[in-house]
Amino acid sequence: MEKVKFGVLGVGRGSSMIKFCETAENAEVVAICDKWEEGLRRKKEELNDERITYYTEADEFLRHPGMDAVVLANYATEHAPFAIRAMKNGLHVFSEVLPCQTLAEAVELVETVESTGKIYAYGENYCFMPAPKEMRKLYREGRLGELEYAEGEYVHNCESIWPQ
């Protein structure tokens, strides 16, 4: 089985995706990028894998030879622009947070997916957290009665992923 060669943008939250790729039999990390040089240096020491190339410049990273896809684990406000750049560079994209800040960004992102034919995946995971799972269980058990309309709201503290 040929492995999908990933690049990861962001060594902070991207660390979990790096670990996943290390254990998946069909994936491998070939490049990691972060403008935070100290974090990048620590990740390089931690992984101690000479097959991985490390970058501080995103444009250079997006041109890494042989890379198939990128995981975006950078600031939330940067996901759509980076996703668009990556797909225009021939790469598939996985965004681990909501990518678009405006409708215009969303339109441009969709148009880029359509024009490049690349896969764009948004990795929303809150639906697998305990609270939504419990609500689904209660509904399926009939403990909420007949549902005619429901609306929910979730507010996540995103201070850590929004630039200061």
Language model features with spans:
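N-terminal Rossmann-like dinucleotide-binding module
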Residues: 1-49
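Predominantly a Rossmann-like dinucleotide-binding segment in NAD(P)-dependent oxidoreductases
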Residues: 126-164
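Nucleotide donor/acceptor-binding cores
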Residues: 2-4, 118, 148
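Beta-strand-loop-alpha-helix segment that lines the small-molecule cofactor/substrate pocket
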Residues: 64-65, 69, 75-128, 142
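Structural detector of well-ordered beta-strand residues that form the stable sheet scaffold
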Residues: 55, 94, 121, 150-151
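Glycine-rich, N-terminal phosphate-binding loop of Rossmann-like dinucleotide-binding domains
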Residues: 73-74, 154
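Conserved SAM-binding strand-loop segment of SAM-dependent methyltransferases
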Residues: 51-58
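Short, Asp-centered acidic motifs that coordinate Mg2+ and/or phosphate
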Residues: 31, 68-69, 149
